[in-house]
C-alpha cells in the first residue's frame, strides 16, 4: 500500500467545498437544500477515513500526527473564532463577562464563525479514531464499536447544544470508519459505477424521507 497522493480526492474535496458554499447561500429550504445537507459534510469525514488508511497513519508516531492535525485544524479554528468574537464585541457592548462567555463557548465548540464547528469536530474525531485503531487490532471489533458510536445520536435525540456537539463527533466517527474501510474497495476498484448509482439513488430517497 503506497503513499502516492490520491489526486482525485483533491477534486472531490473541491466539489465538496462547492456544495458547502451552495448549501449556505441557497436560502430556500426545499428538496435540493435537504439533499445537499445530507452528504456534503459527511463527504469530508469519509475522505478523512480514506486518507488515514492511505497514509498508514496508524503505523506512525501518534504525537507527531496530533501536533500536525492541531496546526492544520485547531489553529485555523482559533483564528476564525477570535476574529468572529472581535466582530461580535465591536457590534455589541464590550464587557469582560461577555468576552469570557464568548471564549468559553468557542472552546466548547459553540462556534461564533458558523461552519467552523467542522474543524474541531474533525480534529477530535480523527484523534480518537487513531487511538482506537492503534489499540484495537481486530477490524470486526473496530467496526462494531464505530457502529455503536454512530447509532447513539440517532437513538438519543437531543436539543441540548453541547450534547449536539458531542453527537456530531459520534456521527463523524461513523463516516470516518466508512472511509477507512472503503479504501481497499476503492483501490481495488471493487466499487463500480453501478454501485455508485445505487448509493446515489439511496441517498436521495433517504434524504427526502428523513428531511
Name each model feature, range by range.
Residues 1-211:
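Alpha-helical transmembrane segments and their immediate juxtamembrane cytosolic regions
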Amino acid at each position: 500500500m503506497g503513499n502516492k497522493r490520491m489526486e482525485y480526492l483533491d477534486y472531490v474535496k473541491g466539489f465538496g467545498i462547492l456544495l458547502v458554499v451552495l448549501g449556505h447561500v441557497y436560502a430556500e429550504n426545499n428538496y435540493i437544500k435537504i439533499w445537499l445537507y445530507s452528504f456534503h459534510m459527511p463527504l469530508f469525514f469519509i475522505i478523512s477515513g480514506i486518507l488515514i488508511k492511505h497514509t498508514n497513519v496508524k503505523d506512525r508516531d501518534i504525537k507527531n500526527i496530533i501536533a500536525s492535525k492541531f496546526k492544520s485544524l485547531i489553529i485555523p479554528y482559533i483564528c476564525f473564532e477570535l476574529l468572529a468574537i472581535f466582530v461580535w464585541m465591536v457590534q455589541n457592548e464590550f464587557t469582560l463577562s461577555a468576552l469570557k462567555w464568548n471564549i468559553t463557548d468557542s472552546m466548547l465548540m459553540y462556534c461564533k464563525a458558523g461552519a467552523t464547528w467542522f474543524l474541531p469536530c474533525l480534529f477530535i474525531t480523527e484523534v480518537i479514531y487513531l487511538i482506537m485503531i492503534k489499540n484495537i487490532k481486530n477490524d470486526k471489533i473496530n467496526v462494531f464499536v464505530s457502529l455503536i458510536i454512530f447509532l447513539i445520536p440517532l437513538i438519543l435525540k437531543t436539543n441540548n447544544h453541547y450534547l449536539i456537539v458531542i453527537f456530531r463527533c459520534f456521527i463523524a466517527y461513523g463516516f470516518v470508519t466508512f472511509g477507512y474501510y472503503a479504501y481497499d474497495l476503492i483501490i481495488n476498484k471493487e466499487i463500480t459505477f453501478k454501485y455508485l448509482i445505487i448509493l446515489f439513488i439511496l441517498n436521495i430517497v433517504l434524504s427526502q424521507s428523513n428531511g
